[in-house]
A protein has these predicted regions:
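Positively charged
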Residues: 1-180
Length: 180
């Protein structure tokens, strides 16, 4: 298994709407690497574009440990509906290290998605899992938590965001010069 590099705010792939996954043949290897990467970074969720992959795929483990079996895999997900009261909760993001913002989201979400075996499901999720699903679906649509808060909150982290953006541009230039 491999730990993949997590790309940060400022990398163009994070602002793209991710493509549907058509071929599930090698998906388990990618999923395994994504879980390794997420656990290494001490996250509870990870979208494929956060590791540089343009695909509608994300994983979640709200237990935050490798030992527990609370893993969730969502392929070609789309939000069918959002229900319940809006709730405010502090969210962080592996692509925006050091930044945590109070984000308002609906209490529950209904998601249509595929599993790695190709089966389609439509389920309702609430609590931390429901919130994490909404967060990761935002990633797959090019949306960050910073886009979900007001201007006053965004200004508080302006310096950190500019630094992340600058570092991402430098990393992309370096990779380009090396032929990646």
């Amino acid at each position: 298994m491999a730990v993949l590099e997590i790309v940060h705010y400022g990398d163009p792939i994070l602002r793209k709407k991710c493509k549907s996954v058509k071929d599930l043949e090698d998906i388990n290897s990618i999923i395994s690497d994504m879980f390794d990467s997420m656990y290494e970074a001490e996250g509870i969720g990870l979208a494929a574009n956060q590791v540089g992959l343009d695909m509608n795929l994300f994983i979640i483990d709200v237990t935050h440990t490798e030992e527990a079996d609370e893993t969730h895999i969502f392929i070609n997900g789309s939000i069918v509906s959002k229900q319940g009261e809006d709730q405010v909760f502090q969210e962080g993001c592996l692509s925006m290290p050091g930044i945590a913002l109070d984000v308002t989201r609906p209490e529950k979400v209904t998601l249509k998605y595929q599993t790695p075996d190709g089966e389609w499901h439509e389920d309702e999720f609430g609590g931390l899992l429901g919130r994490a699903i909404q967060h990761e679906m935002d990633h797959l649509n090019g949306v960050f938590i910073v886009d979900r808060v007001g201007e006053v909150e965004r200004i508080k982290y302006q310096a950190e965001l500019k630094e992340l953006e600058s570092n991402s541009k430098s990393r992309l230039r370096s990779r380009s010069e090396k032929g990646f």
